[in-house]
């Protein structure tokens, strides 16, 4: 397969429509040749050799009409005025733009299997070779010469092992007869890995460039050529191992080496040797730059093979990651006070634990026999007009009684079996970052600083690495050691306590923590000790909660029942804290609060705030900031109205929906670096000054910037139905609020929102329109769908002061909205849409003006699909 193209154009070339000033002012010569050949076809077919070969070459020469330095002179006139052939050639090359490209590629060179022999791991068929070489030469007015070379050589090895299973109990049917032995009977072990792959690549990029010396007004100053080289060697191998049918393992190790064999006298960052090309030192694998190791484990927990737990499906996944990164060469030999230090490299690891569990409760109910019983039907009289038979009625009475009993029993079973499904997902992510690490990994991987650390373990390795002299001892080292921890819990359940009533429960909890510290390694002789400096912890927290007890209590700009409870709860919480810590409850300040636990102490405000807005008793609420168990929120939908004759007569469908979401969020918490623990065996006045803040309260070990409580009824209630005449009606009420408490200024911000929506929809079936778009029939028959929504939303923001009777509305607005749309399908692919949106906003504060927005128009939508 050979393709060739060529092009030539001269100055003044152009189309008839182009004027003289628009035509080309340069001569262009260009050709391009590309060849694709499978060289393996030239060899005997029985060898099975595949050698895909690709060669390409192109050149482009652009000669301008005018000289590039003297723009008002033609190039020909300058060449004629040249004093010598050397000067003439110099002027010509200075004006020309010349580019030459060459590429040689062998991609996918391999031997295919030509026999039915059993594959072996040492077969050459498992190997694939790749070679790619590209070269670009260029010169123009500014660049005297430039050469770019890119070389890539790779080898890939892949082999899939045939499974060798060990199943010792598979055929022992006489020994394992019961279902409870199934978990042991199904025991299996795969003795060989599933697959092994190995990839290696040599990548070399070379660039040489020299700028042209143009009109320097004297002899050339001898601008040096610029060199840029990027030589790397990449090596990676992967092992996939299905240890059992339920347990699989994946391990990948990857190395990235930097090759720097082009420096004179092997001095890194020194002078480069100009004579060396991409082929010199080709098999020099260089020094490690980056190394990573990844371990993945998936385990299908066989608990469902035990009959009692057959309703449980559980999966555990683990991933561990390790990465070593070379440090900067600039800090490899850093001098300070006559000593030379190495600031080292960085290592980091991470792991992830995922547990996904599903409980199919219907299987559990069937296993324990909690299923509804069929209702026996009473035999009716067979002959119309026949008088009742007293004996038969007497026989049917026990059946009717049993039928009522069965219905009652089934109703109870419906309630007991209302939980249909439970889903529990837990994930935990951990990571460690350690700078100043002096060790270098091996070629195929490393087990330092510990085997566990390289596979993702979060065991503390700081002190071990320091004792073994693996950390830098530079006294002014300021990179931080860091760890991260994230825990996520999601719980959901589906309930159906009665027919057509579906309830979805959801709960979640998220905890994120980041720990950082500076450190110093003190060297005393041959002993090294790790010293932690300025430890700091920060993070955030979020959990689903329940605020419905105060959702409908009075709360406006004049007063708030929950806020008044918040104020009153402070004293109760303060006395509890003082009592729990062994402080004197009767030793009070001017406001009547125990000393050290004042009315504006963070330790007092937080539980008092949570108790007030969640409707809990301040005498029983937890005084800590974090909660362990998420409280579920819910979505509810009832569609059982259509069972009743009146609804069935007047409606096609009728549903009632309700939803509730509420969360408790700590936006940021961090450790108090100024914290000092008080001695509660002493009275308040005898405490050390450093245990108290400026307000005289005991300092808190953890500081919070602000906490938020959010609540949404989405919707509070929604009625959605369609009448028999195809009129669709939707009525919806939404309610939400956001309460934020700032510990910086002890201000509470409350954002309230209420929205009312009424929607109408109607479909005119088979509306006929005369149009040429319909083809020969000249008539389009389609449905016209119309929809209108009217909404009113009120929201306002109120700032409340704890110690002042001065609530203020700082923002808010009332928004009226009207949306109307109509769509009509002119064909299978063409739809026309008319829309009209009207919005009017009236703000709650006098400094903002009312605003009206109207959007209307037509949309034509064409679907290019089938």
Language-model segment annotations:
Residues 1-866:
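Exposed, low-structure sequence patches enriched in small/polar residues
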């Amino acid at each position: 397969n050979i393709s060739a193209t060529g092009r030539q154009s001269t100055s003044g070339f152009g189309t008839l429509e182009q004027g003289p000033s628009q035509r080309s002012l340069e001569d262009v010569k260009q050709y391009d040749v590309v060849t694709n050949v499978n060289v393996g076809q030239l060899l005997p077919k029985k060898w099975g050799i595949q050698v895909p070969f690709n060669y390409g070459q192109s050149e482009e020469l652009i000669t301008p009409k005018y000289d590039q330095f003297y723009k008002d002179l033609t190039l020909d006139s300058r060449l004629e005025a040249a004093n010598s052939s050397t000067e003439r050639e110099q002027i010509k090359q200075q004006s020309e733009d010349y580019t030459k490209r060459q590429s040689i590629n062998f991609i996918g060179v391999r031997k295919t299997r030509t026999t039915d022999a059993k594959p072996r791991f040492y077969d050459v068929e498992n190997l694939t070779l790749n070679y790619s070489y590209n070269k670009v030469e260029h010169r123009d007015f500014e660049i005297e010469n430039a050469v770019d070379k890119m070389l890539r050589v790779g080898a890939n090895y892949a082999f899939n092992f045939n499974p060798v299973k060990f199943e010792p109990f598979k055929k022992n049917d006489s020994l394992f007869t019961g279902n409870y032995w199934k978990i042991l009977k199904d025991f299996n072990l795969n003795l060989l890995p599933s697959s092994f792959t190995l990839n290696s690549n040599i990548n070399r990029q070379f660039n040489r460039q020299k700028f042209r010396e143009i009109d320097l007004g004297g002899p050339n100053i001898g601008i040096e050529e610029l060199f840029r080289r990027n030589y790397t060697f990449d090596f990676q191998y992967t092992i996939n191992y299905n240890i059992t049918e339920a347990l699989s393992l994946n391990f990948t190790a990857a190395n990235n080496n930097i090759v720097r064999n082009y420096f004179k006298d092997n001095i890194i960052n020194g002078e480069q040797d100009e004579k060396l090309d991409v082929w010199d030192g080709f098999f020099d694998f260089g020094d490690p730059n980056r190394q990573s190791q990844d371990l993945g484990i998936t385990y299908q927990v066989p608990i469902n093979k035990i009959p009692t737990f057959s309703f449980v499906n559980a999966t555990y996944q683990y991933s561990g990651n390790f990465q070593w990164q070379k440090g900067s060469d600039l800090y490899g030999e850093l001098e300070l006070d006559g000593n030379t230090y190495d600031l080292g490299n960085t290592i980091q690891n991470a792991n992830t634990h995922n547990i996904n569990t599903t409980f199919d409760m219907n299987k559990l109910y069937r296993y324990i026999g909690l299923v509804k019983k069929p209702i026996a039907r009473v035999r009716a009289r067979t002959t119309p007009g026949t008088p009742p038979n007293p004996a038969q009625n007497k026989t049917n009475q026990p059946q009717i009684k049993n039928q009522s009993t069965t219905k009652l029993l089934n109703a109870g079973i419906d309630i007991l079996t209302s939980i249909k499904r439970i889903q529990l997902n837990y994930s935990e992510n951990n990571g460690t970052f350690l700078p100043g690490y002096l060790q270098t990994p091996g070629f195929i991987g490393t087990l330092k600083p510990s085997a566990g650390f390289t596979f993702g373990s979060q065991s503390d390795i700081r002190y071990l690495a320091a004792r073994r002299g693996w950390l830098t001892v530079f006294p002014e080292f300021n990179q931080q050691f860091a760890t991260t921890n994230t825990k996520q819990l999601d719980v959901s359940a589906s309930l159906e306590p009665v027919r057509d009533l579906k309830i979805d429960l959801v709960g979640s909890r998220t905890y994120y923590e980041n720990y950082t510290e500076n450190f110093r390694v003190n060297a005393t002789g041959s002993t090294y000790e790790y010293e932690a400096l300025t430890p700091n912890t920060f993070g955030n927290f979020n959990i689903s909660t329940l605020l419905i007890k105060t959702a409908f209590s009075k709360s406006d700009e004049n007063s708030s029942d929950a806020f008044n409870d918040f104020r009153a709860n402070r004293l109760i919480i303060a006395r509890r804290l003082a009592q729990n810590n062994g402080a004197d409850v009767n030793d009070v300040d001017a406001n009547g609060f125990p000393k050290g636990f004042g009315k504006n102490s963070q330790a007092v405000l937080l539980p008092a705030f949570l108790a007030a807005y969640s409707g809990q008793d301040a005498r029983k609420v937890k005084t800590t900031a974090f909660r362990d168990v998420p409280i579920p929120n819910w979505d509810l939908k009832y569609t059982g109205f259509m069972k009743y004759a009146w609804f069935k007569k007047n409606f096609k469908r009728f549903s009632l929906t309700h939803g509730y979401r509420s969360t408790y969020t700590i936006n940021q918490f961090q450790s108090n670096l100024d914290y000092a623990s008080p001695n509660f065996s002493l009275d308040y006045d005898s405490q050390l000054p450093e245990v108290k803040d400026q307000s005289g309260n005991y300092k808190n070990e953890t500081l919070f910037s602000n906490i938020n409580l959010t609540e949404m009824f989405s919707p509070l209630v929604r009625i959605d139905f369609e009448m028999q005449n195809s009129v669709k009606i939707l009525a919806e009420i939404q309610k939400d609020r956001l309460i934020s408490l700032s510990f910086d200024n002890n201000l509470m911000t409350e954002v309230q929102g209420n929205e009312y929506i009424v929607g109408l929809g109607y479909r005119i079936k088979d509306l006929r329109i005369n149009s040429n778009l319909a083809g020969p029939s000249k008539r389009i028959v389609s449905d016209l769908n119309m929809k209108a929504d009217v909404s009113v939303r009120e929201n306002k923001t109120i700032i409340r002061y704890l110690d002042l009777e001065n609530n203020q509305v700082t923002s808010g607005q009332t928004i009226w909205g009207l949306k109307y749309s109509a769509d009509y399908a002119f064909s299978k692919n063409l739809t026309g849409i008319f829309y009209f949106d009207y919005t009017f906003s009236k703000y709650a504060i006098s400094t903002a003006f009312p605003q009206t927005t109207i959007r209307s128009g037509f949309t034509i939508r064409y679907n290019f699909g089938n």
